[in-house]
């Protein structure tokens, strides 16, 4: 039976340009990751903490990745020193297809 469990990781970014996309200060991104492989990274929510308002628009952008890209490779891209990750929350979401 195929595993449809996805992991949503909420990352608090500081200054920086992860994935080479210009970001404002303290944006929150929700990344949907496959439990075994990364099929694509979807930026669903862009939350501006300083204004406490939901922002969709241009920041709701999909990033297509090759299926064989590992999670460790993605974490190498997200350098803690470069973009200053303030915190990370992992949630498990089960999708019934």
UniProtKB/Swiss-Prot annotation:
GO cellular component, one term: membrane
Regions crossing the membrane: 5-25, 27-47, 77-97
Membrane topology qualifier: Multi-pass membrane protein
Cell compartment(s), UniProt: Membrane
Keyword annotations of the record: Membrane, Transmembrane, Transmembrane helix
Protein name in the entry: Putative uncharacterized protein YAR069C
Source species of the chain: Saccharomyces cerevisiae (strain ATCC 204508 / S288c)
